[in-house]
Amino acid sequence: IVEQADTHMNRTLFLVLALVLAACASAPPPPRNLENACDLIRERPDIYRAMRQAERQWDVPVYVQMAAMYQESRFDSDARPPYRFAAGVIPMGRQSSALGYSQALDGTWDEYRRATGNRRARRTDIRDAADFMGWYMNQSVERSGVALTDARNQYLAYHEGNAGFNRGSYNAKPWLLRIAREVGERADRYQSQLASCRR
């Protein structure tokens, strides 16, 4: 009887392990060529479909979403901030709770789920992440007056939060101003590329 219980336990453990590994393996890898929007959507049409759906729902252009998501996660579903270290060697946890394609923080993600009723939304799901970005960027229109086509300022509001953006907190961060400029430039490139690859 003990031997049968051990065998059953081993099978159960093996099954659970196999399911966990399968779940981890099922996340698609980031696209290989992030510089060309046409290559990106050919390799990962799910990204384009998710962003088109978010564009229909929230009016945020695909190229703005793509530029912001590139900057936040490089289209990696499991992207996380780096660890903090004490004395340079002792891991002290991650720099923030950001996770997934959109790098949404725990609190902001919870606010999104409450506001939209999308209680089962996951930050590692491209459809949910694109919808979150659309929702958040619409908050930036309402709270900060940032146009949905203004990728640079949308990114600043996304990074700093609307209250921080309204205070101009980004002005004390030259590195962030540089990144926001790059997001705006990338959005312009993606817009041109998307127009050419749809022909």
Predicted features along the sequence, with ranges:
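C-terminal motif of bacterial Sec signal peptides marking the signal peptidase cleavage site
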Residues: 20-23
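Residue-level signal for mature regions of secreted extracellular proteins and peptides
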Residues: 17-18, 31
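Catalytic glycan-binding domains that act on GlcNAc-containing polysaccharides
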Residues: 27-199
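Sec-dependent signal peptide recognition
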Residues: 10-17
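Short, Lys/Arg-enriched N-terminal segments with co-localized hydrophobic residues
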Residues: 1-8
